[in-house]
Amino acid sequence: MTRQLLCLGLVCGALGCSSSSSNSGPTTPGPSTPAAFSTSVRVTDAITGSTVSGVTASGDGVSGRASSLAGTMTVGGDSSSASARAVAFTRAGYVTRTVAMKIPGNEIVVSMIPSTFNLDAYDELLRAPRLQRWTSAPPLRVQTRTLQFTSINQSDAAAIDEVMSDADRLGLEADLSWALPQLTGNTFQAFAGITRDTIDVNGRMQVLNTGVITVARYAGLTTATGYWGYSRWQFRTDGTVIGGTIMIDRDFDRSSRSERRSLRAHELGHALGYTHVTILTSVMNASAVTEPNTFDRQATQIAFLRPPGNVRLDSDPAEASLNRLGAAVWSRGEGFRRR
């Protein structure tokens, strides 16, 4: 399945300058008046992790000098407030970053995206239209009994008289575990846990489960839909992903096709809340023939340095949004159609 490409713009930074009259020589800036309230900030490059100097902060009642060579700066406010205020961090060569920060407050790290990074592809992958992601490593539940496919929207499934071999199960778990760090910016090194279930023949299993990623083989998925895999994810309105389900066609998964690992990684991406990429090569291309690459690793690294709800260009949600759980819904889902 595909989705509509967002109409996107580009961002650039600009530097201002001033000049003195011809009768006066160079002037040395005097010491700035310290703000009554302040917060320490360290600015880093979201991809390399290196510090960024020359970053300026702006916002309502906000003051402060540009970040040092060590990437440090102090952001001051004209008053103290228990609520966070929007502060924009700007530097040429980087996308302007807007965060919600408390002044005064504890030291924060602000990561900035280089302007050379493909924001259009990033938006396709992760922000549709706002960032969706898990906030803690999900557990994985493997159903070893093959289930009967009836619909991409089915909430439960009947089990048939067929069980995944131990070798197939271990291979599936290994591929998903291999893909997880690469699809989470190395934030999640492993699933929170892996459990295996084998329900009785003709028993029924709930396939939409909160707090876990459920994966199973389905008989008849490709025949009915043309897809080798299909996945859905559950998310709150603030962008936090809290559940996922992965359907893999039984016949495809038992085959020795070269795309099997890339398909598994692709479907895991959907269960993590990601959508199809059309602009450049990615594990989340609808063809699902590409394993996680540099773009995927960098994009998810950036994403996991931002809270759910972050929007283009690079603006974090207000504190009120971060603290609101909101309702949870299941996505319509996306699939990998056979070629």
Briefly describe each language-model feature range.
Residues 13-16:
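C-terminal motif of bacterial Sec signal peptides marking the signal peptidase cleavage site
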Residues 18-21:
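Bacterial signal peptide processing site
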Residues 23-31, 92-98, 102-168, 180, ...:
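Disordered inhibitory propeptide/activation segment of secreted metzincin zinc metalloprotease zymogens
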Residues 27, 236-238, 242-259, 275-339:
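Metalloprotease/metallohydrolase-associated module, dominated by Zn2+-dependent proteases
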Residues 30-54, 79, 145:
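Structural motif
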Residues 51-77, 101:
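Short, acidic Ser/Thr/Gly-rich low-complexity loop/linker segments typical of extracellular
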Residues 81-93:
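A short, solvent-exposed beta-strand micro-motif common in secreted/extracellular proteins
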Residues 166-271, 275:
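Metzincin-family zinc-dependent endopeptidase catalytic domain
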